[in-house]
Amino acid sequence: AIFVDLEPTVIDEVRSLDIERPTYTNLNRFDGAINVDVTEFQTNLVPYPR
């Protein structure tokens, strides 16, 4: 398991956006699809060699 602390990244983003109380919509860079077709998962998977 890998633990990544994103707090420094969020703090930098808030400072660069100059927003006093940011919401998730301010910090999200990519629009997430609510409805995803199961066949699209295969195109987004990255093979991991064993």
Swiss-Prot record:
Gene3D superfamilies: Tubulin/FtsZ, GTPase domain
Described purpose of this protein according to its UniProt entry: Tubulin is the major constituent of microtubules, a cylinder consisting of laterally associated linear protofilaments composed of alpha- and beta-tubulin heterodimers. Microtubules grow by the addition of GTP-tubulin dimers to the microtubule end, where a stabilizing cap forms. Below the cap, tubulin dimers are in GDP-bound state, owing to GTPase activity of alpha-tubulin.
E.C. designation(s): 3.6.5.-
Protein's recorded name: Tubulin alpha chain
Oligomeric and partner information: Dimer of alpha and beta chains. A typical microtubule is a hollow water-filled tube with an outer diameter of 25 nm and an inner diameter of 15 nM. Alpha-beta heterodimers associate head-to-tail to form protofilaments running lengthwise along the microtubule wall with the beta-tubulin subunit facing the microtubule plus end conferring a structural polarity. Microtubules usually have 13 protofilaments but different protofilament numbers can be found in some organisms and specialized cells.
Catalysed reactions, semicolon-separated: GTP + H2O = GDP + phosphate + H(+)
Organism field: Populus euphratica
One annotated GO molecular function: hydrolase activity
